[in-house]
């Protein structure tokens, strides 16, 4: 039997202590299987971004159990979490977070070079190939400041894929884009999911984006109030 890519059991996250503590995630239990494209929906303040940060090992859970690729995440030292994150997880945010003084190619290369401590020819070839794949073959050496919003988000997607992650966590990836560029980004996510088997968890307020996913999970006030069954 194949294990789920992500296994969360009674996962909770609180901020603050004592009477000032605020519980943002409340005993969430779910699985995400390899190759799925899952929409994470819910109103603002429901805990979507916090859940993505916990799944991405950027925030530690307060209680519960989290396993990714079968490996327990809770309690791992930060150095181990950083290595795991770099090798196995990709991130796309609503605001692209590109390094403004770097070219498109240099931005895509950054996670790979950071993980290895150096840049290699094979890394550059893969980064260039990813930029071609997302339709930016004529923008490879453009500075990030010169790119449009949609182009920046496609660079961010290529950057998320540079280390061949098993899971990409996308937090409102089309939320800052007009309809045309947003459609381009969602088409690319769908193609990469179908062709490469990369798993995506996509936080969104957009019903059209959620409809492009294979299933959905709904958060309300930090609780999982609905989810389609895992494939």
UniProtKB/Swiss-Prot annotation:
It comes from the Bacteria. Belongs to the ABC transporter superfamily. Lipoprotein translocase (TC 3.A.1.125) family. It is a peripheral membrane protein. The keyword Transport applies. Its EC number is 7.6.2.-. InterPro entries: AAA+_ATPase (IPR003593), ABC_transporter-like_ATP-bd (IPR003439), ABC_transporter-like_CS (IPR017871), ABC_transpr_LolD-like (IPR015854), MacB-like_ATP-bd (IPR017911), P-loop_NTPase (IPR027417). Coiled coil: none annotated. Keywords: ATP-binding, Cell inner membrane, Cell membrane, Membrane, Nucleotide-binding, Translocase, Transport. The complex is composed of two ATP-binding proteins (LolD) and two transmembrane proteins (LolC and LolE). Part of the ABC transporter complex LolCDE involved in the translocation of mature outer membrane-directed lipoproteins, from the inner membrane to the periplasmic chaperone, LolA. Responsible for the formation of the LolA-lipoprotein complex in an ATP-dependent manner. It holds the Pfam family ABC_tran. This is Lipoprotein-releasing system ATP-binding protein LolD 2. Transmembrane segments: none annotated. ATP binds at residues 42-49. GO terms for molecular function: ATP binding; ATP hydrolysis activity; transmembrane transporter activity. Residues 6-230 form the ABC transporter domain. One of its GO terms (cellular component) is plasma membrane. SUPFAM superfamilies: P-loop containing nucleoside triphosphate hydrolases (SSF52540). It is found in: Cell inner membrane.
């Amino acid at each position: 039997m194949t294990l789920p890519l992500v296994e969360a059991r009674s996962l909770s996250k609180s901020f603050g202590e004592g009477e000032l503590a605020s519980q943002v995630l409340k005993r969430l239990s779910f699985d995400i299987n390899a190759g799925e494209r899952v929409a994470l929906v819910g109103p603002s303040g429901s805990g979507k971004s916090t859940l993505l940060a916990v799944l991405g090992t950027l925030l530690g859970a307060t209680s519960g159990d989290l396993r990714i690729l079968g490996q327990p995440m809770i309690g791992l030292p930060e150095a181990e979490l950083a290595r795991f994150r770099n090798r196995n997880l990709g991130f796309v945010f609503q605001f692209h977070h590109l390094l403004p003084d770097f070219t498109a190619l240099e931005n895509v290369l950054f996670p790979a070079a950071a993980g290895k401590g150096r840049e290699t020819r094979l890394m550059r070839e893969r980064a260039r190939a990813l930029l071609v794949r997302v339709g930016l073959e004529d923008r490879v050496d453009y500075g990030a400041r010169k790119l449009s919003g949609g182009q920046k988000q496609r660079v961010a997607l290529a950057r998320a894929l540079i280390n061949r992650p098993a899971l990409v966590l996308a937090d409102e990836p089309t939320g800052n884009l007009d309809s045309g560029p947003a459609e381009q980004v969602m088409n690319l996510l769908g193609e990469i999911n179908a062709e490469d088997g990369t798993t995506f968890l996509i936080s969104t307020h957009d019903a059209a984006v959620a409809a492009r996913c294979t299933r959905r999970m709904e958060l309300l006030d930090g609780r999982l109030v609905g989810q389609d069954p895992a494939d």
